[in-house]
Amino acid sequence: GLLLKRKKSCYEMTRMNGRSVEVEDNVVIKPYPNTIEIDGDTVRSFDYNTLVAAGNNVDIDNNMTEQMLSDKKITFAAGNEVKCGKNILGYVKVNSTVGNKITEKNE
């Protein structure tokens, strides 16, 4: 699982099975319970400074560009895995928190 906690929150977890992510208070959180597939239309609909959080996997379309993600300041959190194309792998590695791994998708 995945726990999202705002930095100024007073909430304290004493026991947890999964991954905890602390986020800035001004970040827009888009939570998805299992898996989310991200494409250009999805990114265009996100607000600036959005954290895409999935309980399991984030799957980013191969046509996504680093510019599209950085223009909106999109970050990712996944309980398991984030998958993306080689062209944005560096951006995704720097801007993701995962419970398991970040992998390059085969085209």
Language model feature labels by segment:
Residues N56, D61-N62:
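Conserved mixed alpha/beta catalytic, RNA-binding, or beta-rich assembly cores of soluble enzyme
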Residues L4-N17, V23-V28, D41-L51, N62-F76, ...:
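Short, T/G/N/S-enriched strand-turn elements that build extracellular solenoid repeat scaffolds
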Residues V27, P33-T35:
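Transition segment at domain starts
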Residues E81-G85:
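A short amphipathic beta-strand at an alpha->beta junction
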Residues G1:
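Small, basic N-terminal interaction modules of short regulatory proteins
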